[in-house]
Amino acid sequence: LNPYAFHFEEIKKITKGKLQKIVLASILQSDFVYNYEYEPVADFPVYDSLLERYGKEIPNPEVLVATRSKIDIKKHQRAITATGQPAPDFLLADSSGKTYSLKDFAGKTVYIDAWASWCGPCIAELPDYKKLVDKFKDRQAVIFVSVSIDDTKTAWIEKGLNKHHPPGLQLWAGKGGWRSTFAKNYYISGVPQYMLVDGEGKIIDFNAPRPSSGEKIGNAIAEALKKKELGPAYFKM
């Protein structure tokens, strides 16, 4: 019995009537949407089956319709951000106003860090981020790009750059923060978020390991560089 199916059946045993419907609806609206965002795509048929089975027990059809809509969005997001898909291009400026496009980094492995000056977890990652950048300082084939989603350029510079001195190339997503084109195209729903893109502009990992993962992210970058050096034909042998 699938853990979620077991969970649902247990809830049905210990709750009744209106309370049961409320609890089941709550799980569908929260846990299920989360699964479609973070769990393996291969597991989607299982969750589809559970949604079909237990969704019928939700008395309010609007809840089920809204949940299905959210899930459809997540499925689409996962499809276009899957490994091998082209990463969305961007045109963003650094603190001096010089603009950069993802295409400018063609041929290089790109580690993208979406962050904000007000984000505690983002700041907590900086010591390890600096170590990661330093580890690959002699490798010209990798570049570290941080994109701030601070609402204003002033906040980004004064509270972010000047205060914390983050490493790598520092860019600003532009006005709007969460509503900026970058945030929308990269589906930034929380920060920090890290992404790894190969030299052809294709996604390696849209939810790459954090700098604090240590060897995990170090090995991921090293593997990407190795593939670039040996060429794709080598890995098809």
Task: Give the location of each predicted region.
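Active-site acidic short loop of glycosyltransferases
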Residues: 106-108, 139, 165, 188
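Short beta-strand segments
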Residues: 113, 144-148, 172
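Structural microenvironment flanking redox-active thiols in thiol-disulfide oxidoreductases
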Residues: 124-163, 177-183
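Thiol-/selenol-based redox modules, centered on thioredoxin-like
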Residues: 196-237
